[in-house]
Amino acid sequence: MVKIRLRRAGRKKMPVYQIVAADARAPRDGKFLEVIGRYQPTAKPHSITIDKERVEYWLGVGAQPTTTAQSLLRATGLLYEMNLKRKGRSEEEIVSEMAQWQERQSARLQKRLAVKARRRQAKKDAQAAAAASAE
């Protein structure tokens, strides 16, 4: 069985993962069939590059993505786009749906960043209040 999974590369404490199509019996960093993307978790923000045509090919011939690889494919919107194609939507509908999806994702990211900033500020204020009351 062919799996779409991550293959670790990079150096110590600075991982870079290649998204590969590999035989399920092969070791994690061992023999693989094809490199179909790259994931850099240490970049800010993390970056995912994927060759969409090759991923569609491998999924089309029955390759199964691992849980982590599937979440990365979902984060890029590739699985959503393939689902729209499978439902028989026209190319214009797919393009408009993907644009809406992209807007929702960017809004979600902005919301997360705002929550993170609020929490950071609240923590800073609490520490300042604790320092002031300690004096």
UniProtKB/Swiss-Prot annotation:
GO terms for cellular component: cytoplasm; small ribosomal subunit. It holds the Pfam family Ribosomal_S16. The keyword Ribonucleoprotein applies. InterPro entries: Ribosomal_bS16, Ribosomal_bS16_dom_sf. GO terms for molecular function: structural constituent of ribosome. Keywords: Ribonucleoprotein, Ribosomal protein. One of its GO terms (biological process) is translation. Belongs to the bacterial ribosomal protein bS16 family. This is Small ribosomal subunit protein bS16. The lineage of its organism: Bacteria, Pseudomonadati, Chlorobiota, Chlorobiia, Chlorobiales.
